[in-house]
């Protein structure tokens, strides 16, 4: 059985979600705005115990924060006093080029917060959410995001981006650097990445489209779909189907393995690779690009040269069929 690091994420983050969301009744609410100026690149640290956060690009040298607080009415506390303290002294501060947003420790459980933040284009970010969604658009990065329970969406990050979620989905679009995405339980979607991509989920589907760099993808339980692949591929699935659409470059290697599930490769007529296929229990069917120099000792093993045979493609599944169209 193939084990993935994402399989342990859900349990690791459960406590965060429980602490952030259990027990009290709804209390009073209020909002506050803060503005800061910066003479150089900004570092943003955002920590939200419960609530949604959105970060987008605004004017150079200027940071604006709008916070909406909803205080939890714990039986032993005074929610009106808590809200008054929040509005007069919100967890928003500046220290040189560092902007900090959000409470830490036990204070994170006293309220929910929705943050709307605009930052200069040259901003790097570290964002953490206990329970809630995190949405980031257009910053320079690098960017690192973590969520216990909720979705992470990041668009057009100009450098490396890494996102990790216990229970929820990750969607990363048009990133210019390297991409890392991991979920314990949820879907991973990566589109238009310029750099290498690493995607991992314990339980959920992975979809990668138009990645220009090398791709590594692994799923404990769920399907994997990769479209418009050209560079190196390394794909692993314990339980689920694998569907690949693309054309490996002349010197690239595609290594695709499944424990239980079918593997399907869609390649164009001008594809050029050496193909090696093995299935423990299932059939191998090659009906797409013209295959030459074929070799098959039985219905579970197959070798062939597709086109000029410049790249190398290896596909193996313990229980399932292999198809090339």
Language-model segments: residues:
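Pocket-lining segment of extracytoplasmic ligand-binding domains
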Residues: 222, 240
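Transition segment at domain starts
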Residues: 245-247
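Bacterial N-terminal signal peptides
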Residues: 8-19
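Bacterial N-terminal signal peptides that target proteins for export
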Residues: 1-9
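Short amphipathic, basic-aromatic surface patches that mediate peripheral association
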Residues: 263
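Acidic (Asp/Glu) and glycine-rich low-complexity loops/linkers
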Residues: 2, 20-129, 135-147, 151-165, ...
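Extended ligand-binding clefts on enzyme/binding-domain cores
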Residues: 260
């Amino acid at each position: 059985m193939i084990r993935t690091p994402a399989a342990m994420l859900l349990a690791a983050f459960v406590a965060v979600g429980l602490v952030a969301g259990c027990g009290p009744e709804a209390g009073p609410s209020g909002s506050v705005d803060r503005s800061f100026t910066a003479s150089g690149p900004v570092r943003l640290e955002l920590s939200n115990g419960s609530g949604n956060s959105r970060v987008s690009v605004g004017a150079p040298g200027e940071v604006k924060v709008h916070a909406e607080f909803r205080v939890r009415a714990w039986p032993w506390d005074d929610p009106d006093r808590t809200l008054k303290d929040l509005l007069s002294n919100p967890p928003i501060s500046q220290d040189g080029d560092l902007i900090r947003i959000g409470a830490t420790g036990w204070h994170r459980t006293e309220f929910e917060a929705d943050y709307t933040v605009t930052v200069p284009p040259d901003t790097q970010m570290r964002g953490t959410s206990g329970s809630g969604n995190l949405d980031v658009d257009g910053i320079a990065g690098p960017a690192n995001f973590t969520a216990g329970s909720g979705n992470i969406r990041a668009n057009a990050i100009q450098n490396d981006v890494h996102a990790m979620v216990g229970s929820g989905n990750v969607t990363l679009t048009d990133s210019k650097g390297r991409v890392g995405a991991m979920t314990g339980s949820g879907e991973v979607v990566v589109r238009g990445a310029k750099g290498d991509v690493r995607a991992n989920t314990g339980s959920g589907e992975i979809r990668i489209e138009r990645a220009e760099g090398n791709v590594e993808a692994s799923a404990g339980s769920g399907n994997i779909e990769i479209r418009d692949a050209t560079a190196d591929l390394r794909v692993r699935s314990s339980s689920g189907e694998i569907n690949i659409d693309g054309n490996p470059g002349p010197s690239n290697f595609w290594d695709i393995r499944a424990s239980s599930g079918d593997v399907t490769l869609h390649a164009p007529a001008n594809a050029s690779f050496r193909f090696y296929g093995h299935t423990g229990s299932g059939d191998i069917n090659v009906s797409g690009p013209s295959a030459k120099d074929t070799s098959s000792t039985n219905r579970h093993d197959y070798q062939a040269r597709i086109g000029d045979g410049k790249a190398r493609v290896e596909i193996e599944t313990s229980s399932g069929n292999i198809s090339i169209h």
